[in-house]
Amino acid sequence: MNIKKLCQVIVLKSQFAVFLPLIFISALFWVFSSIYGLTETIDTGGALKNSFKPPAKNLTSKNTLPMFEAPPVERFNPQEAGAKVFIRNIKFLNNTIFTRREILTVIGGVPSRSFSLTELFKLADKISRHYRNQGYFLARAIIPNQKIKNNTVSIVILEGQYGKIYSEGDAAYGPQVMAYLNDLKTDAVIRSDPLIRKIGVISQLPGFETEYTLSPGAKIGQSDLRVKIEPTSHAFGSLNLANDGSRFFGKNRGRVDITLIPEVIFGDQINMTLMKTSETFYLGRIGYARPIGHDGGRVKVEMSRSTYDLSGQFDPLEGHTTGYLAEVSYPLLIGNQKETDAVLRVQRDEIVEMLAGAKFEKRVNEKFEFGISFEQKQSLLTASRRFGQITVATTNVSSDRAGAAQGRAVILSGNIEQHQRIARSSVLKSRLVFQAASRQNLNSLEGFSLGGAHGIRAYPVGEASGSNGFLGQFELYESLYAASAAYLFLDYGQVTENAGEKTRRLAGVGLDVQFSNKRLSLDLSLAQRLSMAASSVDPSNRDPQFWTSVNINF
């Protein structure tokens, strides 16, 4: 039975036969976002550089975002209402955030009527909810025991202030943690936005695990903030073996990623990558990142180097690529289950190619990029999650070879994912990747390609390449056991090819099986074409396509 028929059988027999309608519903969520890892083509320099990019399929969210829940507002038994009392004035005590006039507006103005105790409690309830809606999630209004004099009732507002602010855990990191909390002061009113931001920034520092609690303080209305931090492993990495390369650079590849936490300063990180394919293709990268200040900003610098000797019809061609990158990022928003970051990136790539031992071309690609990344988690019931990136870049390519593609271009690109739980063990994942460029004939460093293990999986890497295009993917996941899952997938994409501005549309369908634990993960995928188009980059025209990836953490 071929893959296409097998998918039909599974969909018909599955309790999730709503797959196709859900695809349409999911498509309504798409907005623009950035492309990662779908640009490897025969244009050699760009293809090598793109090997450093995380594949778009692996676009992942950040660490768990901090979340604070307000305690419930007290409810009172109406049977305790008792007799009514005439009220014509309310006295508010301890309010510093909102004025008397603002609070009266919330409760509907100065009362002049009889109130039961329950009705007075409802007034306090409105005030408490107003504070919490404005982010003061520990605030509450209470009506203390009192004698009503001159028809005036007193309402005490406990706005919720910081008591003691301190760190626990490894004492060596205490001063560094407290530097991030300096803006939070004892006796200041607790507001969710600045607190979540501080906790979120600390939680995202590499090489550490954090735990935070708010507990009753020494005074009424105060809460102590405790941040516990413990170091994790300061050296770790992974080995990845996959067959997702191109036939010119080598379909099979091995890649090692190593991360070090050197602690030159608190929160810094070194990343190193080494990769070798089944052909004569080597590449490496080293990068260093560190915080800027104590508000979540980070700076990163990287250098990469690759060498290659092509096979097949490009057998006489060899060369090397040297890349430089500088990046600054800053979290614009860290809130309850949502985050938005801005990134500014400058990049330069120098590509030198040799043909039969003689210099063929030297090409320089300079790029200035601004991007916005975002993540949003919704209710735990639906387990909805959306995350992605949007980038705008200007590029300038120069070459010493006559007739080579060069010049300036503006590129808008995007990558966005949505995960939606549709049953207890089933999740529908949908994804859109697109790119729009101001001109055609971009090299593969900036181009757009549909085929590959992270694109339309029924076609080989480099299939259908151009400057403008989009890719849509839909995956229906079903958890099998604690560490394994299987899913059906549908891929569809369109690209305007540089040669003659021809538009190509490709589609594929298939099955994927995954297994993972802390040390090992395995991904097996089999995809068959839905479109009639044959491959233009692989003479074998293999259909279906089989992809495999093994990842070992150490």
Locate predicted features.
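Outer-membrane beta-barrel proteins
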Residues: 260-264, 287-294, 329-336, 370-381, ...
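Outer-membrane beta-barrel "beta-signal"
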Residues: 258, 453, 513-522, 542-554
